[in-house]
C-alpha cells in the first residue's frame, strides 16, 4: 500500500513545490490517488510533458496503484486558478 | 539449427528449480521476453496507425468498465468523432495488451488515446484538453471532425 506521505516525500524531493494536494480516492485503501501539484518545474512544459515528468517521479508508486490522476500547474497558472475560484 | 535453439530455451524454462536465480536473466530468456515485446510492439504500432483515433480502454464504449475509461469515451462522443474514424481496444480482454501498451506508450495507466498515431494522453489530459478547447482543435486539425460551421441565421429559405 502506498501512503500519501510516501507520495508527498517523493514529489518534494524531486521538485520545488508551491502547493500540493494528495487525495486518496480509494476511500482510505491507498490504491487510488489524485495529486494536484503546483511547481515552477512545470514552466515551459506542456501538459503531457508535465504528466510524464510526474509519472517518472512516482514511477514505483504508480506501478502499485490501481488508479492515478494528476493536475499540474505552474505558480502563475495556480494564481489564475485561485482568482477564478474566488470570482 | 532452429530445433537446437528451441531445445535450448525449453531446457532453460523446464527446470527452474535447478537453475540458479542469476540464470533467470540468462540471454535466452531475456531474448524471449524482448522478442514477445517486439511482436506486441509491432501490433500496437500498426493498430495506432490504422485508424485516426485509437483508444485503449477498460471495457467497450457501450460498456466501459472503469470511470476513467467511461469519461474518455464520453468526451470523444461529445466531439462527434465518427465511428469509422475510431477504434477502441479492451485491455481487460487481452492481458498481454494491457501490459504491453504501458510499455509501448511509456505510460502507466489506462485509458490511453492516440490520434493519428501520436500519443495524446490519458483521461486527465483528455478532460483538460476538452475544457480548454485544445481537443476540438486537435481533432479538427487531424481531420477527424469537420471545423465548426460559422453560425448561420435560422431563417428558412425556399
Write out the residue ranges for each language-model feature.
Chain A
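Short, surface-exposed ligand-recognition loops at beta-strand->loop->(often short) alpha-helix junctions
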Residues: 1-2
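Short secondary-structure junctions
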Residues: 11-20, 61-65
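Short edge beta-strands and adjacent turn/loop segments
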Residues: 17-34
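Solvent-exposed beta-strand sheet faces enriched in polar/charged residues
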Residues: 23, 36-38, 71-73
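Histidine-centered active-site/metal-ligand motif
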Residues: 32, 51, 66
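A short interface-forming secondary-structure element
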Residues: 34-48
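C-terminal structural segments of small proteins and small subunits
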Residues: 55-87
Amino acid at each position: 500500500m502506498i501512503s500519501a506521505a510516501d507520495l508527498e516525500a517523493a514529489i518534494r524531493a524531486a521538485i520545488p513545490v508551491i502547493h500540493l494536494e494528495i487525495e486518496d480516492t480509494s476511500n482510505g485503501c491507498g490504491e487510488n490517488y489524485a495529486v494536484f501539484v503546483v511547481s515552477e518545474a512545470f514552466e515551459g512544459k506542456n501538459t503531457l510533458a508535465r504528466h510524464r515528468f510526474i509519472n517518472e517521479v512516482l514511477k514505483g508508486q504508480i506501478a502499485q496503484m490501481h488508479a492515478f490522476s494528476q493536475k499540474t500547474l505552474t505558480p502563475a497558472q495556480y494564481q489564475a486558478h485561485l482568482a477564478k475560484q474566488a470570482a | 539449427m532452429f530445433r537446437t535453439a528451441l531445445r535450448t530455451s525449453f531446457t532453460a524454462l523446464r527446470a527452474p528449480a535447478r537453475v540458479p536465480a542469476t540464470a533467470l536473466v540468462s540471454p535466452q530468456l531475456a531474448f524471449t521476453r524482448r522478442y514477445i515485446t517486439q511482436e506486441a510492439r509491432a501490433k500496437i504500432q500498426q493498430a495506432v496507425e490504422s485508424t485516426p483515433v485509437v483508444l485503449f480502454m477498460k471495457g467497450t464504449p457501450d460498456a466501459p468498465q472503469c470511470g476513467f475509461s467511461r469519461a474518455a469515451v464520453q468526451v470523444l462522443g461529445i466531439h462527434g468523432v465518427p465511428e469509422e474514424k475510431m477504434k477502441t481496444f479492451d485491455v481487460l480482454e487481452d492481458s498481454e495488451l494491457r501490459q504491453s501498451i504501458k510499455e509501448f506508450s511509456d505510460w502507466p495507466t489506462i485509458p490511453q488515446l492516440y490520434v493519428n498515431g501520436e500519443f495524446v494522453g490519458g483521461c486527465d489530459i483528455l478532460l483538460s484538453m476538452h475544457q480548454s478547447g485544445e481537443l476540438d482543435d486537435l481533432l479538427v486539425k487531424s481531420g477527424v471532425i469537420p471545423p465548426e460551421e460559422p453560425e448561420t441565421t435560422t431563417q428558412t429559405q425556399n
